[in-house]
């Protein structure tokens, strides 16, 4: 079976209402993307919890609709003109769309083929659970099945956190909290590098399912808890040698007092999910408790780190908030 894919190029303000109209006219699915994606003029849009993007679509948005060919009862040649006429009746005067035929595929196999083992630093390998591990006796292999959770190791923010962990020389028996853990990849890596105990938390129940499954696959002792479970691992009096949060700049700032409150005196914090242009603002927020700095930059993203100062330890809030979900 094949599907009919139609791609309309429209202005930002037209994208969402056009998508709704196409669904009303029988589209199986609709996606909106940057028409310049992959090119020089590509314009990233980021939405963070508590902070909406300045615009909701791109100046030139590609609206892609997928149709079942069986909906075309009037013959192939008439389908697009009739669709355009129907759209015109509800206020859309559009040029004919690009058209493609999408063949039915084994979508699971296709998706899996897009993930390959990733080497990070000298020793860490992120290996999809359906791939064989590399033949390297010194490799620290992280078998990951992301499911619906963020964290496959391919994104620069995750990559930076893993690289930070690999380059630390004294992790044995250091306690670590992975805040907003997603697939659990950072917590699992920390456990394999010697951290103990290791705790991961995320507001998303699907992330907990993926993270616990990944911990089992990797034979690692990591505890994953939801923030509303009342776990002692998240109690105000429980502190950690390392607090790691790979979320986004706005929630990192909003949750700064709670994150700092989870740090032991002299403990370290690692913050990722921050664009290079946002680094100064995040650093300013955390400077009331520690002296944060940019540890490393990759593809426009930065990883920040810092150590809790003794004279500022008591200024952090004791209220521990739920981690924000990361959206990509």
From Swiss-Prot:
SUPFAM superfamilies: S-adenosyl-L-methionine-dependent methyltransferases. Pfam families: PrmA. The gene is prmA. S-adenosyl-L-methionine binds at residues 158, 180, 202, 246. It catalyses: L-lysyl-[protein] + 3 S-adenosyl-L-methionine = N(6),N(6),N(6)-trimethyl-L-lysyl-[protein] + 3 S-adenosyl-L-homocysteine + 3 H(+). One of its GO terms (biological process) is methylation. CDD domains: AdoMet_MTases. This is Ribosomal protein L11 methyltransferase. One of its GO terms (molecular function) is protein-lysine N-methyltransferase activity. Methylates ribosomal protein L11. Keywords: Cytoplasm, Methyltransferase, S-adenosyl-L-methionine, Transferase.
């Amino acid at each position: 079976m094949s599907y009919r894919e139609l791609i309309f190029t429209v202005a930002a303000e037209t994208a969402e209402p056009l998508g709704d109209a196409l669904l009303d006219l029988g589209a199986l699915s609709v996606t909106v993307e940057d028409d310049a994606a992959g090119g020089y003029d590509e314009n990233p849009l980021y939405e963070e919890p508590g902070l909406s993007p300045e615009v909701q679509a791109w100046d030139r948005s590609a609206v892609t609709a997928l149709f079942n060919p069986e909906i075309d009862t009037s013959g192939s040649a008439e389908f697009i003109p009739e669709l355009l006429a129907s759209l015109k009746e509800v206020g859309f005067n559009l040029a004919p769309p690009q058209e493609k035929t999408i063949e039915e595929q084994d979508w699971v196999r296709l998706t899996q083929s897009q993930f390959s083992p990733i080497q990070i630093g000298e020793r860490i390998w992120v290996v999809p659970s359906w791939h064989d591990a590399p033949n390297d006796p010194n490799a620290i292999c992280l078998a990951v099945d992301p499911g619906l959770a963020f964290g496959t190791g391919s994104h620069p923010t995750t990559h930076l956190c893993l690289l930070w962990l690999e380059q630390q020389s004294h992790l044995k028996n250091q306690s670590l909290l992975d805040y907003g853990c997603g697939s659990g990849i950072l917590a699992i890596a920390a456990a394999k590098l010697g951290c103990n105990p290791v705790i991961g938390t995320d507001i998303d129940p699907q992330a907990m399912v993926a993270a616990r499954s990944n911990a089992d696959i990797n034979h690692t002792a990591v505890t994953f808890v939801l923030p509303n479970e009342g776990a002692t691992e998240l109690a105000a009096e429980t502190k950690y040698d390392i607090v790691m949060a790979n979320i986004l700049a706005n929630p990192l700032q909003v949750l700064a007092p709670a994150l700092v409150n989870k740090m032991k005196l002299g403990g370290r914090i690692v913050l990722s999910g921050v664009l290079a242009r946002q680094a100064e603002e995040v650093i300013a927020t955390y400077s009331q408790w520690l002296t944060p700095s940019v540890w490393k930059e990759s593809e426009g993203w930065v990883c920040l780190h810092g150590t809790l100062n003794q004279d500022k330890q008591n200024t952090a809030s004791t209220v521990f908030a739920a981690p924000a979900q990361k959206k990509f």
